[in-house]
Amino acid sequence: MNIAVVGLSHKTAPVDVREKLSIPDDVKEKATSQLRSYPHLEEVAILSTCNRMEVYVVAQETDDGIRELTQFLSEWSQIPLLELRQHLFILLHQDAVMHLMRVSAGLDSLVLGEGQILAQVKQTHKLSQKYSGAGPILNRLFKQAISAGKRVRTETSIGTGAVSISSAAVELAQIKTEDLSAHRVAIIGAGKMSRLLVKHLLSKGANQIAILNRSLKRAEQLADQFQGADLKLHTLADMQAVLTESDLIFTSTASTEPLLDRDILEPIVCDRQSCMIFDISVPRNVHSNVNELSQVHAFNVDDLKAVVAQNQESRRQMALEAESLLEEEVASFDVWWRSLETVPTISSLRTKVESIREQELEKALSRLGTEFAEKHQEVIEALTRGIVNKILHDPMVQLRAQQDIEVRRKAMQSLNMLFNLNSSQGVAKQRNT
């Protein structure tokens, strides 16, 4: 078996491709179930954000598993496989492990060191467990990646002062307008990204902010976090009226369909000189045809790269420090992974010794007769079990801890031969991975 990741990111695909492959949380159960139905995929975890979509798998046969996974991605996105392949990356075992560690630490993000990705990795792990996608291997991998992400943020300064997608969008708006306090702002959406938009807009001097959301209650919950700010709250029913009065529009919702297009915006902007729209959603909330309107200047997440680049250079040295920590985490995971090949031998040895213990205990108790107290039987049961555990403990620990692959395999072969165990198939199977 092998660990693999197949996916795309802001580095390999533009937003119009990424949005077609987006797998939001509300459809992950369906996607996970479909992937688990393929014969060569044992475990599955789907990480889907505005800047990446990656599927982590444990495959019985690597080539067959990759083929099944890429075919699924083509069908899901409705992009022909030949066209999709140019945007996909495929990483196997140690490379896949290191990739998830880097993602979790924020080293593969558009915004180097950003903190949101760690929460997204945690959510991926949680849902992969909930929907029976992750098994023992991906569970261990994601736990270690989450731990690595926390460690990098604790032991380095990579997360200090890091810009986010939201702050980069606000920075771009300030560059384009110079004075945010003189402009009326509308934010469509009331989730985490919108909360960050409000935070950064207020810090840059914006003071005329309206929040539009399907649920007014959710908008109120967002406003409660900014008690001193005069935020205007509206439902989407008021969208046309609010946008008519807005100079800057930010969109950040989980909608899979565009909320704004040319037909909606044309009557809104017909009597003004310009309107700027900053769409930080994937899939995009703003249709590309709005650019046909001369008054509209629309920006999406891919347009933020220039802003982010200004923040990156000072963080590269911190990233190098983080990489060395991640190498330790990868090595730790690899030791655990390699120890898995000892499981069939250890399991067979324990089963055989336990069977002998039970047989000999039964003989001894039958000789002692029925008058032998039950309490005494429990004592003898515990005694024999303790002896077995003590005898097996050191050999099992030493076998698992042996990092020299050939030495470990020779030890397993010796145990199989000496105790006449039936774990040879398991050893052979691990040798082929």
UniProtKB/Swiss-Prot annotation:
Q: In which pathway does it act?
A: Porphyrin-containing compound metabolism; protoporphyrin-IX biosynthesis; 5-aminolevulinate from L-glutamyl-tRNA(Glu): step 1/2; Porphyrin-containing compound metabolism; chlorophyll biosynthesis
A single GO molecular-function term is: glutamyl-tRNA reductase activity
Pfam families noted in UniProt: GlutR_dimer, GlutR_N, Shikimate_DH
Q: Which GO terms describe its biological process?
A: chlorophyll biosynthetic process; protoporphyrinogen IX biosynthetic process
Q: Which domain of life is it from?
A: Bacteria
Q: Which reaction does it catalyse?
A: (S)-4-amino-5-oxopentanoate + tRNA(Glu) + NADP(+) = L-glutamyl-tRNA(Glu) + NADPH + H(+)
The UniProt subunit note reads as follows: Homodimer.
Q: Report the family membership.
A: Belongs to the glutamyl-tRNA reductase family.
Please, what other remarks does the record include? During catalysis, the active site Cys acts as a nucleophile attacking the alpha-carbonyl group of tRNA-bound glutamate with the formation of a thioester intermediate between enzyme and glutamate, and the concomitant release of tRNA(Glu). The thioester intermediate is finally reduced by direct hydride transfer from NADPH, to form the product GSA.
Write down what this protein is called: Glutamyl-tRNA reductase
